[in-house]
């Protein structure tokens, strides 16, 4: 039983994961005597490396599943990956471009083959990163959103929704990327503030009686205008509703319509309506049966409807049309305008709201069922609860979901068109006379298949599947608040529609990982952090513990190397404490552990504190309060176990009483064993390493039972005594620090006990006071002599007096403190002068002002302490 002198995370973490996998500790057992507990991993995209957000998300899941496994559940944590349509296709196309090829050179079939090769390579990278993090995944059940089982589920859902009239093909305004030439989901659109312009134009009334003013940021779209809208209650324009204007350049007559969507107070109160190029205009167009005129091609160039501008790029057209409108006197004002413009996350192109024929899911009926579910006992519990409002707000304001994508990589839409009649055929399998039909070229939005993830991974649509019947619905989903709408909501309504059950009981929401300044991590800022680099430098246990305990549910997490380093120091502390314990357990076995012997006050206290810690940690973990769990474990391990109990245990361990030695070893072995178990879900590698060296039974800590409170081991009276001893020792240490006296220098110490009971208690535990206070003379009584020139302290149940005569040069100390007081007076004056300066308060950033206020508080506090010390010395 021995640990190396220095903690080396690389040595500790090497080969351990393979050992766990070999032992099959992470595999679900289907053991009917155990209650099942299920989490499905949010499948990462097979596009490359996992980032810190993934590391955080999966660490939280690993903590939950490791804890449940130890609590005796049959745990299934199902791994898998997402084919990530556009993201993966973009990567493979980039690879081909570097080779001087395009996907069209390969053709669809060969391109898809190339993408599968990419998937195999990057899936391997992801698995190796999961291994580095120590994730307890059941790889025997790993799934991929494009594997055969999931493809079957996707076809089943598409066909079923189509036959119910909930999937339809129609025209709609979608986010269009003119570079990749595909529709984008909202999450693939990144909004950036752009300095543009607002172009003010006058459209002449057809009857020659005047004009109406409109403004736009996209003048090139005016070629597709089919109306001008005003608010029906707007007194300025009421009389114009029903009249027409002449569309400049085009010469088309378009109506003036009344619609309540128009904001009377914005701009002129009149709005040009282009139903084919704006989602709000599209809705207005539908209400007023306006024609939809598309003026662009899929590549962002102008089409035939753009007349003389045909063939121009949209931005070139903008320049030309502005020039022409100015010459005609139509465009009368251009003002600078900062506005938010959508860009494609993949290509960087400005996204075009674009009228397109696409496949859609009719969302209202599905959303209504999900909203109703939240009013029942079988609702999905959001943690923190406030995110339920976010979810319901989205569901109540939902629009139909565009599910088709103009890509080659993904689930091909199971729809065929008859080559002659144009008839549409939708089914699980192609039509029998396939030669007369052509399949839809599009694939489904990636979110369509990932929305089925909780049940498609369990064998659905085969409702007799053993896994589906045992492990579905799942228990917890862990995910970020940024995809509540894109993913969480879709999983809920699809699960309710197809399984009649909620897909998970709880949704644990975390925030985003930000840098130390609170900025979002991004390529442009260059502030991204690779979790594998952190693991290499500090180990997986340090990174995991920091990620898990660094914030509370729903909050963002600020990443800081200093904090990871502090955690690494904590792991070192645990290592050194365990090493000390093991050095004193030579030949001590699991069978030797005996907690029935006569225990010291320190033994009773640490066992009581252990019980309290087990109870608190278990309760907090059940509520997903991992930040609080971290604080409780840190305080127990660092303060109670390492700084106090182990130091006190040295008395019997180095003494001659063999029975006391055996009891101390037993307590130390038991407490360390239980502590490793509590810590294991957070720090799996180091706890397994230490636990294997400790006296133990069982093959691995991963399957050891979760600690239980043992009331018979608690002794609250002893715990109170220990608190008194700790208070006394701390008070003496503080006095020594104040008067600059090292522990090696003996002192005289008088302790006045408040009553005979306290006196007797302190006498019984005199050895601890002598060991940790180093008094040359120790007097414990209910009355003590009054000593001039003494440092005093009051603790609950006792008063301490430490004579200074012979300990320090009082005259010198008074001089030193007076000098220090003078300096502190100057600092207080300086900082208060600064804080009373109106100019400073107005101009300085808030954090700088707060820093100065903190300095003021600190200086005043120090000054009071110095004054008190001087008063004591001068008495």
Swiss-Prot record:
Gene Ontology biological process terms from the UniProt entry: valyl-tRNA aminoacylation
Residue interval(s) of motif 'HIGH' region: 44-54
Coiled coil: 804-875
Record GO terms (molecular function): aminoacyl-tRNA deacylase activity; ATP binding; valine-tRNA ligase activity
CDD domains (alphabetical): Anticodon_Ia_Val (cd07962), ValRS_core (cd00817)
Matching InterPro entries: aa-tRNA-synth_I_CS, aa-tRNA-synth_Ia, Anticodon_Ia_Val, M/V/L/I-tRNA-synth_anticd-bd, Rossmann-like_a/b/a_fold, tRNA-bd_arm, tRNAsynth_Ia_anticodon-bd, Val-tRNA_synth_C_sf
A Pfam family it matches: Val_tRNA-synt_C
Binding site residues for ATP: 523
Function according to Swiss-Prot or TrEMBL: Catalyzes the attachment of valine to tRNA(Val). As ValRS can inadvertently accommodate and process structurally similar amino acids such as threonine, to avoid such errors, it has a 'posttransfer' editing activity that hydrolyzes mischarged Thr-tRNA(Val) in a tRNA-dependent manner.
Recorded family membership: Belongs to the class-I aminoacyl-tRNA synthetase family. ValS type 1 subfamily.
Subunit text: Monomer.
UniProt xrefs under PANTHER family: VALINE--TRNA LIGASE, CHLOROPLASTIC_MITOCHONDRIAL 2, VALYL-TRNA SYNTHETASES
Protein name (Swiss-Prot/TrEMBL): Valine--tRNA ligase
Provenance organism: Anoxybacillus flavithermus (strain DSM 21510 / WK1)
């Amino acid at each position: 039983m021995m640990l190396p002198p220095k903690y080396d995370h690389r040595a500790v973490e090497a080969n351990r994961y393979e050992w766990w996998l070999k032992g099959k500790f992470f595999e679900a057992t289907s053991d009917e005597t155990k209650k099942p507990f299920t989490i499905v991993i949010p499948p990462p995209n097979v596009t490359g490396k996992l980032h810190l957000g993934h590391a955080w998300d999966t660490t939280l899941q690993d903590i939950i599943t490791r804890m449940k496994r130890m609590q005796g559940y049959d745990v299934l944590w199902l791994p898998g990956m997402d084919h990530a349509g556009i993201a993966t296709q973009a990567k493979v196309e980039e690879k081909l471009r570097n080779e001087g090829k395009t996907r069209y050179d390969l053709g669809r079939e060969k391109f898809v083959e190339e993408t599968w090769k990419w998937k195999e390579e990057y899936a391997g990278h992801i698995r190796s990163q999961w291994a580095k993090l120590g994730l307890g995944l059941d790889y025997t059940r790993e799934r991929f959103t494009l594997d055969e089982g999931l493809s079957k589920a996707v076809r089943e859902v598409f066909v079923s929704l189509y036959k119910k009239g909930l999937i339809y093909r129609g025209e709609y305004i979608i986010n269009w990327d003119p570079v990749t030439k595909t529709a984008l989901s909202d999450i693939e659109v990144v909004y950036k503030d752009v300095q543009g312009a607002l172009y003010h134009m006058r459209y002449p009334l057809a009857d020659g009686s005047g004009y109406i003013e409109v403004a736009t940021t996209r003048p090139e779209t005016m070629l597709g205008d089919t109306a001008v809208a005003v608010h029906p209650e707007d007194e300025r324009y009421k009389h114009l509703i029903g009249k027409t204007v002449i569309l400049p350049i085009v010469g088309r007559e378009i109506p003036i319509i009344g619609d309540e969507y128009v904001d009377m107070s914005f701009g002129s109160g009149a709005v040009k309506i282009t139903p084919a190029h704006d989602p709000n205009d599209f809705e207005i167009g539908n209400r007023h049966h306006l024609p939809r005129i598309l003026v662009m091609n899929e590549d962002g160039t102008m089409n035939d409807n753009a007349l003389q501008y045909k063939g121009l790029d949209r931005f070139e057209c903008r320049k030309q049309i502005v020039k022409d409108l100015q010459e005609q006197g139509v465009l009368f004002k251009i003002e600078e305008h900062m506005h938010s413009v959508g860009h494609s996350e993949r290509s960087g192109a400005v996204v075009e709201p674009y009228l397109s024929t696409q496949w859609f899911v009719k969302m209202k009926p599905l959303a209504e069922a999900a909203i109703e579910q939240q009013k029942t006992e079988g609702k999905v519990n959001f943690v923190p609860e406030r995110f339920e409002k976010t979810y319901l707000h989205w569901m109540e304001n939902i629009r139909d979901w565009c599910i088709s994508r103009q890509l080659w990589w993904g689930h091909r839409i199971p729809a065929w068109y008859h080559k002659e009649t144009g008839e549409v055929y939708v089914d699980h399998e192609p039509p029998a006379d396939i030669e007369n039909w052509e399949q839809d070229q599009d694939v489904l939005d990636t979110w369509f298949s990932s929305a089925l993830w909780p049940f498609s991974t369990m064998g659905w649509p085969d409702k007799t599947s053993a896994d589906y019947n045992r492990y579905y619905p799942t228990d917890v989903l862990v995910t970020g608040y940024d995809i509540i709408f894109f993913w969480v909501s879709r999983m809920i309504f699809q699960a309710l529609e197809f399984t009649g059950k909620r897909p998970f009981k709880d949704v644990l929401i975390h925030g985003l990982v930000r840098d130390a300044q609170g900025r979002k991590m991004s390529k442009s800022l260059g502030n991204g952090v690779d979790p594998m680099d952190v693991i290499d430098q500090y180990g997986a246990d340090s990174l995991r513990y920091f990620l898990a305990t660094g914030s509370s549910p729903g909050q963002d997490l600020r990443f800081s190397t200093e904090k990871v380093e502090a955690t690494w120091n904590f792991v070192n502390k645990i290592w050194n404490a365990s090493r000390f314990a093991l050095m004193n357990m030579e030949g001590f076995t699991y069978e030797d552990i005996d907690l029935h012997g006569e225990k010291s006050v320190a033994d009773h206290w640490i066992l009581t504190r252990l019980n309290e810690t087990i109870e608190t940690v278990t309760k907090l973990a059940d509520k997903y309060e991992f930040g609080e769990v971290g604080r409780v474990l840190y305080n127990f391990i660092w303060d109670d176990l390492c700084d106090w109990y182990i130091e006190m245990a040295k008395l019997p361990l180095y003494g001659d009483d063999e029975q006391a030695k055996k009891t101390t070893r037993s307590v130390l072995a038991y407490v360390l064993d239980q502590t490793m178990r509590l810590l294991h879900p957070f720090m799996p590698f180091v706890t397994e390493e230490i636990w294997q060296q400790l006296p133990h039974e069982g093959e691995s800590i991963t399957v050891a039972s979760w600690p239980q409170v043992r009331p018979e081991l608690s002794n609250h009276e002893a715990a109170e005594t220990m608190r008194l001893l700790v208070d006394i020792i701390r008070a003496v240490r503080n006095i020594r620090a104040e008067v600059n006296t090292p522990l090696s220098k003996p002192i005289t110490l008088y302790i006045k006990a408040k009553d005979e009971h306290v006196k007797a208690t302190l006498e019984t535990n005199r050895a601890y006071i002598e060991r940790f206070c180093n008094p040359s003379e120790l007097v414990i009584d209910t009355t003590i002599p009054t000593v001039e020139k003494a440092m005093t302290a009051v603790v609950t149940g006792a008063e301490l007096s430490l004579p200074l005569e012979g300990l320090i040069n009082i005259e010198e100390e008074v001089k030193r403190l007076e000098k220090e007081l003078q300096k502190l007076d100057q600092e207080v004056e300086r900082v208060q002068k600064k804080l009373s300066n109106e100019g400073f308060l107005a101009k300085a950033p808030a954090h700088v002002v707060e820093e100065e206020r903190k300095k003021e508080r600190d200086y005043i506090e120090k000054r009071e302490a110095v004054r008190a010390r001087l008063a004591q010395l001068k008495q």
